[in-house]
Amino acid sequence: MAIYTKLNHQNIQLLANDYDLKIIEFSPLDGGSGNSSYLLKDEVNSYVLTVCDDKRLEEVTKLGQLLLLLKSYNVPCNRLIKTVNGEILTTYTISKSIKPVILKYFIEGQVVKKLNESMLIQVGRKVAQLNKIPSPDYLPKNHPYGRHFFSKALGLAIDNRYESWLSEEIVYLDNKIIPNLPCGLIHGDLFYDNLLFKQSLNKPISFKAIIDFEEACNYYLVFELGMAIVGCCSNDITIDLKKARAFVHGYQQVRKLKDIEKESLQLFVHYAAVATSYWRFNKYNIEEPRKDMIGHHWQMVELSKEVFKISTTRFFDAIFNSD
């Protein structure tokens, strides 16, 4: 990932002064799109300092507020550090641009691309814990790359076949998503690389944390499950229904799904794949064009089609019915 804002030791220490820290070592981290992150170390702890290149102060303040809220509910996630003045963020000014900066404790853990069923049960429990937290008023009511934004990709003549397909998906989803589905606080981007695990000597691997809450919103709770199944239970071609079953099983140990959510889950797995295709198309063809990623959205198009092909009875039985 690109480092948008390049900081030297002097820059780092000036920012660290706002937290009364003396930094002895730092290095850039691979970060999410739209921000620049650095691993900092002092004599005691390790930290992650993030310069939010593409977000406004208001957005980052809300993210900080959310992280503080999650801490109060003991959700295993990034722990925000306030400045010595009690502020959620500080700022870095470059070329007359003021960029928000946040500091979090570094979480030691590993990303696992291929999650097994035991790991997915653990993830399901923690995601359900998150989804039971009352959603704060400051979170958006639409998902940042949900269907309400799909029309932004239409009429651009960048990929006519994709744009035509997406226009049909907008109509399909608008007609199929039923009213009165439960909404609440969701992470919104539960792919495997937003989960950390801990491997201890002579012990099974255990869940450590959920990270990167930039897409958090007050949205359909079943969308959270759909995205997690796409992001953690697929093999790039289709969904592994045994893994999806394990995730949902763990989830329901903490939060029981309503019947309308169970009946809508397959639709929302499909929806999550469509939404991810839109994110990739928008990211790599419009916002940050990359020749090597220009067709990356098609993988999610094909996944969404494979989910659609599964009979509703087979999908429901595989996820919810006892053997």
Give the location of each predicted region.
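A cross-family kinase active-site recognition segment
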Residues: K113-Y162, C183
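Conserved NTP-binding catalytic cores of kinases and kinase-like/nucleotidyltransferase enzymes
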Residues: M1-V84, K198-I205, F320-D323
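ATP/Mg2+ or Mg2+-diphosphate-binding catalytic cores
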Residues: T276-D323
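Active-site activation/catalytic loop segments of kinase-like enzymes and analogous catalytic loops
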Residues: V222-K256, Y271-E287
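ATP-binding pocket architecture of kinase catalytic cores
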Residues: D42-D137
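Short Pro/Gly-enriched beta-strand edge/turn motifs at strand-loop
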Residues: N17-I24, E168-P179
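Active-site acidic catalytic loop and adjacent metal/ATP-binding pocket
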Residues: N35-K41, V48-L49, L80, V171-F223
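All-alpha amphipathic helical-bundle segments outside canonical DNA-binding/catalytic cores
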Residues: D259-V269
